[in-house]
């Protein structure tokens, strides 16, 4: 027995409704040509005009000229690479540092297999995954802060 009821096309009332076009979205403005020919180009040209206006009225300054003879004491990467930089800086063997970095995606791929019995999508009802992600976030923040400090204070964050 089917759960869903199939429409009876031999019903004259249903056939009359379908003949009038009811049940289809024929209301409102059509997308072609109103949106695609008129509204989209106006939005695109308006956005481009705003960008050009901002570039002319408030140009970005490039800063000081580079001096190749005055290098900083320690060159830092961009902020999003601080944890990776800290791992490579602290671990004595560089190959071990690269292996440690490959463990991160491998650990993320293992989470569904570790917690495969949990059917919930709510993160608060998935304690293993939540603990794993919170631990990873704390380690990433710790490594990122340590990368900003000198090498002798980077592991203790200058607290000890």
UniProtKB/Swiss-Prot annotation:
Mode of membrane association: Multi-pass membrane protein
CDD domains to which the protein is assigned, alphabetical: cytochrome_b_C (cd00290)
Gene3D superfamilies, alphabetized: plastocyanin oxidoreductase, Single helix bin
Subcellular localization, as worded in the UniProt entry: Cellular thylakoid membrane
Molecular-function annotations in GO: electron transporter, transferring electrons within cytochrome b6/f complex of photosystem II activity; electron transporter, transferring electrons within the cyclic electron transport pathway of photosynthesis activity; ubiquinol-cytochrome-c reductase activity
One Gene Ontology term from the biological process aspect of the record: photosynthetic electron transport chain
Superkingdom in the source lineage: Bacteria
Swiss-Prot/TrEMBL keywords: Electron transport, Membrane, Photosynthesis, Thylakoid, Transmembrane, Transmembrane helix, Transport
GO cellular component: plasma membrane-derived thylakoid membrane
Chief subcellular location: membrane
Bilayer-spanning residue ranges: 36-56, 95-115, 128-148
Family assignment from sequence similarity: Belongs to the cytochrome b family. PetD subfamily.
Function as written in the Swiss-Prot or TrEMBL entry: Component of the cytochrome b6-f complex, which mediates electron transfer between photosystem II (PSII) and photosystem I (PSI), cyclic electron flow around PSI, and state transitions.
Assembly information from the UniProt record: The 4 large subunits of the cytochrome b6-f complex are cytochrome b6, subunit IV (17 kDa polypeptide, PetD), cytochrome f and the Rieske protein, while the 4 small subunits are PetG, PetL, PetM and PetN. The complex functions as a dimer.
Protein name: Cytochrome b6-f complex subunit 4
Originating gene: petD
């Amino acid at each position: 027995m089917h759960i869903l009821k199939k429409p009876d096309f031999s019903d004259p009332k249903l056939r009359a409704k379908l003949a009038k076009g009811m049940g289809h979205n024929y209301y409102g403005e059509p997308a072609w040509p109103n949106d695609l020919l008129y509204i989209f180009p106006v939005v695109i040209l308006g956005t481009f005009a705003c960008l050009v206006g901002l570039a002319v009225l408030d140009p970005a300054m490039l800063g000081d000229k580079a001096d190749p003879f005055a290098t900083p004491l320690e060159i830092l990467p961009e902020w999003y690479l601080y944890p990776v930089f800290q791992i490579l800086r602290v671990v004595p063997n560089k190959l071990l540092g690269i292996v440690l970095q490959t463990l991160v995606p491998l650990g993320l791929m293992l989470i569904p297999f570790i917690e495969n019995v949990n059917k919930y999508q709510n993160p608060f009802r998935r304690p293993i995954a939540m603990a794993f992600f919170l631990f990873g976030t704390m380690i990433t923040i710790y490594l990122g802060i340590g990368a900003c400090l000198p090498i002798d204070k980077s592991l203790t964050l200058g607290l000890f």
